[in-house]
UniProtKB/Swiss-Prot annotation:
HAMAP family: CobS. Its cofactor is Mg(2+). Its EC number is 2.7.8.26. It holds the Pfam family CobS. The gene is cobS. It is an enzyme of class 2 (transferase). It is a multi-pass membrane protein. This is Adenosylcobinamide-GDP ribazoletransferase. InterPro entries: CobS (IPR003805). It catalyses: alpha-ribazole + adenosylcob(III)inamide-GDP = adenosylcob(III)alamin + GMP + H(+); alpha-ribazole 5'-phosphate + adenosylcob(III)inamide-GDP = adenosylcob(III)alamin 5'-phosphate + GMP + H(+). GO terms for cellular component: plasma membrane. It is found in: Cell membrane. Pathway: Cofactor biosynthesis; adenosylcobalamin biosynthesis; adenosylcobalamin from cob(II)yrinate a,c-diamide: step 7/7. Belongs to the CobS family.
Amino acid sequence: MPSMRKLWIALTFLTRIPLPQPEQVTSEEFTQSQHYYPLVGLILGGALWLALTLLLPHYPPLVTAALLLALELILTGGIHLDGLMDSMDGLLSARTPERMLEIMKDSHVGAFGALSAMVYLLLKFSLLAGLLALSSPLVPYLVLFMPILSRWIFLIGVHYFPYARAQGFGQGFHETSRQTRWLFLGEGLLLLFLTYWVLQWPGIAGFILATLFILLFTRKVSRLLGGLTGDLYGASIELSELLFLLGAFPLLYP
């Protein structure tokens, strides 16, 4: 079952859900597995939706929002948040592009990374708590769609900007990604339709804001560094989730 294998590859790559690692993954399989990233987002979003549905009747919005954040970090292992911290350590260091890349590669978290994570988590927690307090029927579906859309949006950087390092997991994407760009765009149009069908204009506003922000962010960083890195892909996932909630909130707020 090639499709299930590609979903398996995508799941073990983007999450820390306890699954056995697939054996002998080829470069072609790894590249093609990217088309299953939104399905990985659906699994993550489904878990968050279920948790929200079970928790909100028994806990206040602040507690529910904190537990949702914790669950997402557990399911992903915090790998995307780690990418955000490493990216901010490098980008905010005000060093040369070469030195920024070296800082990103360092596994130790610096002050800029720690502060960025704190601000990010505070903003995301506040948005989730604020949305949950609105009691809108769309809010559970915003939480469901958040990881789905973010796993598509970050691929903008994969398809349209070079990889900054000579080696790394992202390099394999760029060797064969040109032939899949039309499919990638088709997937985006399908997600846009589904977002409007389920979430109407609040979802569309969040989707557009997140997509435009990541497009501009990856374009600017790619020009600065000569390309993107795995850490920046992780940062794009986290930032697109935040921007999605930020864009949807005003259209739901009374």
